[in-house]
């Protein structure tokens, strides 16, 4: 009995992790509002959030070209405000996905709430205890062209943006694209020239580029080094002074924009929202403008930088909501969540993503179809820019036809399926959406080449393919024609999308020694001479390998395809014929010889007819195997087919 009593006393002394830090923070909430790092990080009371009317809230994002220092700058701002401790945690704190850390790129936009005390005069805020404190919502965005949709969704929750430019590399292709995304969203743009500590840094040249390309006053640019901390003290004051506060009506019924969502095994769907009007409290009833379904708010809070419950969110603030959504289909990105039983005008939402690359995803083992379906459903909750439809292949069985924003987007999605959900996936050759017109005047958009049936009764009269406007920036270090007198050349071309989705970017980097940068934007469809190419194994078409190519390149591409397949398909006990065909015409062929068992090994001399009988029997057996046998196509073969270039 004494032991049991001691156990009960011990149990009463158990404190949940973080509870002590939370209680200390709640006793001293002013420490959360310091412009210096605080030793105590904890929760934030809803009553404390009430001290931040929209006039003292700033929502801003960081946009830049790849590898110009966005994530490092975000780390320094989190440290400067005491949101994370200096030297604690991992670099690029907001890059939380494994794929982001392995590739060194930002894939998902991440939000963090910071508290910062700022005075509107020249005295430091630390010397003015009555200086007003501000709530700052920082959104770190991706820089690669394939994730521009992620950037545009993040900007919808912001009123301003930090445009980060490398002091050595200057304005790059994606810098231009991101600037116009922010400009079209009517955001206040603060130029930040980063990496000024580099030996090759030339801030004056970058200022001149900003003036020439964007008409930005050079005096507005901030000179910083996120690595050394130089100049960072001027960034947050500029955010507060130059970026307007979020608009909204505090006394109206609550209205929120659903920015993003992801699935948690225990909590269900966690939604990231921006409160446009009113206030959201735990226990409130909210409804979806898209589905009409009603939910109860089970938890609400901010990202500080992890999920921190507050019990309330006020006008202009960005945070998370857990409302008991169990299906990822209920959380529609861009949806308006509002107070139940109230009539509100839905928010504009987002433009639907335009999918540029399509690929089939199939489970490596046909019995894993349900597991793959479940994994894709969870992942698309966190990546709303992917389209998914079910399809069936005679070669690979049940699978999915998925639409992506680009080849890197597709590659990252595959990697996340494997790393986060343990799915083993076979992916087919990526294609782009084509438009075909038949002789009777009917048109059809083809996203899967296998769906383009070879119907002799319906003659294809014309076909169109999507094009893009490509922007290529070449610096002075490369030898340019004499007509280019400036520090760099900005080249614009109209290119077929199919030509750039595979290896155009890598080839451009190769021939320019890595100096050129590349970006593209969607353009119109253009008429072209296209044909469907089928791959046949032993005379049977493999629908998962069908592709659409330009007619003049069909023979070369067909030859490359069959050559690669011959290298990666394992030899069988029967002969395998690999063919590439356009319609009924075979344009390339390779033969994979059969493995041969030495059936004469046990014959030592003797009558020759005995040997002939054994050889004839083996020959008949191979014919029978070829007739009923199936050819196993390894995943490596599909990967190699992706590398077949259409641009040479």
UniProtKB/Swiss-Prot annotation:
It comes from Oryza sativa subsp. indica (Rice). Its EC number is 3.6.5.-. Disulfide bonds: none annotated. Coiled coil: none annotated. GO terms for cellular component: mitochondrial inner membrane; mitochondrial matrix. GO terms for biological process: positive regulation of translation; translation. GO terms for molecular function: GTP binding; GTPase activity; mitochondrial ribosome binding. It is found in: Mitochondrion inner membrane. It is a peripheral membrane protein. Transmembrane segments: none annotated. This protein may be expected to contain an N-terminal transit peptide but none has been predicted. It catalyses: GTP + H2O = GDP + phosphate + H(+). This is Translation factor GUF1 homolog, mitochondrial. Promotes mitochondrial protein synthesis. May act as a fidelity factor of the translation reaction, by catalyzing a one-codon backward translocation of tRNAs on improperly translocated ribosomes. Binds to mitochondrial ribosomes in a GTP-dependent manner.
């Amino acid at each position: 009995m004494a032991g049991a009593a001691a156990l009960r006393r011990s149990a009463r002394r158990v404190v949940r992790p973080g509870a002590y830090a939370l209680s200390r923070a709640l006793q001293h909430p002013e420490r959360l509002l310091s412009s210096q790092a605080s030793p105590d990080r904890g929760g934030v009371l809803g009553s404390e959030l009430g001290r931040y009317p929209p006039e003292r809230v700033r929502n801003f994002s960081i946009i830049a070209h790849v590898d110009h220092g966005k994530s490092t700058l975000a780390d320094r701002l989190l440290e400067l405000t005491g949101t994370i401790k200096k030297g604690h945690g991992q670099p690029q704190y907001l890059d939380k996905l494994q794929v982001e850390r392995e590739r060194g790129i930002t894939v998902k936009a991440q939000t963090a709430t910071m508290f910062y005390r700022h005075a509107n005069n020249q005295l430091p805020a630390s010397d003015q205890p009555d200086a007003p404190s501000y709530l700052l919502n920082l959104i770190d965005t991706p820089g690669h062209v394939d994730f521009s949709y992620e950037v545009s969704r993040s900007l919808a929750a912001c009123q301003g943006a930090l445009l980060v430019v490398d002091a050595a590399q200057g304005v790059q292709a994606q810098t231009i694209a991101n600037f116009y995304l922010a400009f079209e969203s009517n955001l206040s743009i603060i130029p930040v020239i980063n990496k000024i500590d580099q030996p090759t840094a030339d801030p004056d040249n970058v200022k001149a580029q900003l003036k020439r390309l964007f008409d930005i006053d050079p005096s507005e640019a901030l000179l910083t080094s996120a690595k050394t901390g130089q100049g960072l003290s001027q960034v947050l004051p500029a955010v507060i002074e130059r970026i307007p506060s979020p608009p909204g009506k505090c006394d109206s019924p609550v209205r929120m924009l659903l920015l993003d969502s992801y699935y948690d095994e225990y909590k269900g769907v966690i939604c990231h929202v921006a409160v446009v009007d009113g206030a959201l409290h735990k226990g409130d009833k909210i409804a979806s403008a898209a589905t009409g379904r009603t939910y109860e708010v089970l938890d609400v809070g901010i990202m500080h930088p992890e999920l921190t419950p507050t019990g309330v969110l006020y006008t202009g603030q960005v945070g998370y909501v857990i409302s008991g959504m169990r299906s990822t289909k209920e959380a529609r990105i861009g949806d308006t969540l509002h107070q139940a039983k109230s009539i509100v005008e839905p928010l504009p939402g987002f433009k639907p993503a335009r999918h540029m690359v399509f690929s089939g995803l199939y489970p490596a083992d046909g019995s894993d179809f349900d597991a793959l379906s479940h994994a894709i459903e969870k992942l698309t909750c966190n990546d709303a820019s992917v389209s998914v439809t079910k399809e069936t292949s005679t070669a690979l069985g049940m699978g999915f036809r998925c639409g992506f924003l680009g080849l890197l987007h597709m590659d990252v999605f595959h990697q996340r399926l494997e790393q986060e959900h343990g799915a083993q996936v076979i992916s087919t050759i990526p294609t782009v959406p084509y438009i075909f017109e038949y002789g009777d005047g009917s048109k059809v958009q083809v996203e899967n080449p296998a769906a383009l049936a070879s119907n002799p009764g319906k003659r294809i009269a014309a076909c169109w393919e999507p094009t893009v406007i490509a922007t290529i920036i070449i610096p002075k270090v490369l030898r340019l024609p004499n007509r280019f007198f400036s520090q760099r050349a900005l080249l614009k071309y109209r290119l077929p999308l199919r030509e750039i989705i595979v290896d155009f970017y890598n080839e451009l980097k190769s021939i320019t020694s890595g100096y050129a940068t590349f970006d593209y934007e969607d353009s119109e469809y253009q008429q072209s001479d296209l044909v469907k190419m089928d791959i046949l194994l032993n005379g049977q078409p493999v629908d998962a390998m069908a592709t659409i190519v330009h007619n003049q390149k069909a023979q070369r591409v067909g030859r490359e395809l069959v050559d690669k397949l011959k290298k990666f398909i394992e030899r069988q006990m029967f002969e395998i014929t690999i063919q590439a065909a356009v319609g009924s015409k075979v344009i390339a062929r390779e033969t994979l010889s059969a493995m041969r068992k030495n059936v004469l090994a046990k014959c030592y001399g003797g009558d020759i007819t005995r040997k002939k009988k054994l050889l004839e029997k083996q020959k008949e057996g191979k014919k029978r195997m070829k007739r009923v046998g199936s050819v196993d196509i390894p995943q490596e073969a599909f990967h190699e087919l992706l590398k077949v270039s259409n641009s040479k």
